[in-house]
Amino acid sequence: MRRTIRTAVTAGLLAAPVLLGAAACATAPTTEAVGLGDSYAAGPLITPQDPSSPGCLRSLVDYPHRVALQKGYVLHDVSCSGATTDDMFASQTGYDGKAVPPQLNALRSTTDVVTLTIGGNDIGFTGIIENCIAFTPTGPTRSGPKTCKAFYTAGGTDQLAARIAATRPKVDKVLQEIKRRSPSASTSVAGYPAILPEAGACYPQLPLTPTDVG
């Protein structure tokens, strides 16, 4: 009888680490993260690039990846260069000419963390920069007038400010849809960096007039 008990106890002790290990694996929490956004999220041409979606020019060391690596998240990064708020809901044409699925399709009810950078392409960021390039420190600009400010002012109204105001509800709509699809997720919105000095100019490194910089 004692031998039987001893054998049972020994078997139980030997099995315990296996059972505990299996339980730990089964209950170990994983944090599911989704990266959404445009080129400022995707990191175009920063190597190494993501081969799964070459048309998005998405880096494997963009900020969604860096955050996920630091925090230990399981990441699904669908950020895509050139994306607008519309591309959150509908297919986007990548730089390779192929269709890119709507970014919001990556969200699940189990998603825990979402990062988002969007809106710059809605206001036409690239075109604005191109139009504002000045041929000399005092102008004219590529758009024609001496300053970019003059080009984007019509009837006394700042057209760029109007574009920004019109983009806000579009971003709000994206955030609302994220909440609907992933109600438990924590969403972080990363803005855009300041690329101009507070005052003055640094022509020709930044080929803009002092008026447009200030």
Where are these regions (language model features)?
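Secretory targeting and sorting signals
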Residues: M1-A28
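Hydrophobic alpha-helical membrane segments, chiefly transmembrane helices and signal peptide h-regions
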Residues: G12-L19, V61-H65, A190-Y192
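Serine-esterase "nucleophile elbow" of acetyl-processing enzymes
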Residues: C25-G82, I133-T141
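Structured segments of extracytoplasmic/periplasmic soluble domains
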Residues: S39, G43, R66-Q70, V74, ...
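Solvent-exposed loop/turn segments at secondary-structure junctions
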Residues: S39-A42, Y73-V74, C80-D86, G120-F125, ...
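Short acidic, glycine/proline-rich loop/turn micro-motifs
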Residues: L45-D50, F89-A90, C202
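Charged, often glycine-rich, active-site loop that binds/positions anionic groups
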Residues: A83-P101
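Alpha-helical cap/lid subdomain in secreted, periplasmic
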Residues: P101-G214
